[in-house]
């Protein structure tokens, strides 16, 4: 959500602290795994820095049970350069998302909905559609050179880590339905206009071949 706003407030300024992922596919991404914690609390910042450095503020004097979560200089340098282009890249993402919203006009497809307030700024890390024939559509698009992905294919309560709680799909009917229908379309600043059109046309062709309604 780097660069997103709710009203006049930037993402990362809600609460005592916030975390940003710098995974390569994020809006502000490094060339490998990385992330940051932001806060305006100096004491909390010192604690987080120590935890990320084996739990020590002074070498070999471990104040906390910590981790090795320090970002290396190469990744930091790359992010420093990419940060200059974040607003421009987010503007491109918004344009791509708007094209999808305007041209994927099959009523059988559930498109993402946002509250359209001028003071807010959605930065479209993902563009996720939903359809009950998700797997067939993904296979069809792949055959036409369109890479899609299923982000978070298992809802949290059904993960093996929580099997001890003995949850069932019926306990979470909405989340369980979504996990079977969600599909993320390509959205990144470098995608070309022709590639975006190809994505939309391929989706239309899929439904034409399936003899389902499409305008």
How would you name each of these model-derived features?
Residues 1-14, 18-21:
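Conserved PLP phosphate-binding loop immediately N-terminal to the Schiff-base lysine helix
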Residues 5, 40-215:
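PLP-dependent aminotransferase class I/II
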Residues 9, 26, 84:
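Glycine-centered loop/turn positions within well-structured domains
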Residues 10-14, 37, 166-169:
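Short, hinge-like loop/turn segments at secondary-structure boundaries
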Residues 13, 30, 69-70:
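Hydrophobic transmembrane-helix microenvironments that flank and shape a buried ionizable site
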Residues 20-21, 35-40, 80:
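Short beta-strand-to-turn element immediately C-terminal to the catalytic PLP-Schiff-base lysine
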Residues 23-25, 188:
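Residue-level recognition of the GNAT/N-acetyltransferase active site
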Residues 27, 31-36:
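Glycine-rich phosphate-binding loop of ATP-grasp-fold ATP-dependent ligases
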């Amino acid at each position: 959500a780097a660069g997103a706003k709710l009203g006049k407030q930037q993402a990362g300024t809600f609460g005592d602290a916030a975390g940003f992922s710098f995974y390569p596919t994020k809006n502000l991404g490094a060339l490998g795994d990385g992330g940051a914690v932001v806060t305006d609390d100096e004491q909390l910042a010192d604690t987080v820095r120590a935890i990320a450095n084996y739990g020590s503020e002074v070498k070999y004097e471990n104040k906390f049970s910590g981790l090795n979560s320090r970002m290396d200089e190469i990744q930091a340098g790359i992010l420093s350069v990419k940060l200059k282009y974040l607003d421009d890249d987010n503007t491109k993402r918004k344009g791509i998302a708007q094209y999808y919203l305007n041209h994927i006009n099959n009523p059988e497809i559930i498109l993402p909905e946002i509250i359209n307030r001028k003071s807010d700024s959605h930065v479209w890390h993902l563009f996720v559609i939903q359809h009950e024939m998700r797997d067939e559509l993904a296979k069809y698009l792949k055959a036409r050179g369109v890479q899609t992905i299923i982000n978070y294919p298992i809802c949290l309560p059904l993960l093996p880590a929580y099997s001890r709680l003995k949850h069932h799909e019926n306990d979470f009917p909405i989340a369980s339905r979504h996990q079977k229908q969600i599909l993320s379309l390509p959205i990144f600043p470098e995608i070309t206009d022709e590639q975006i059109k190809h994505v939309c046309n391929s989706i239309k062709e899929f439904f034409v071949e399936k003899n389902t309604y499409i305008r």
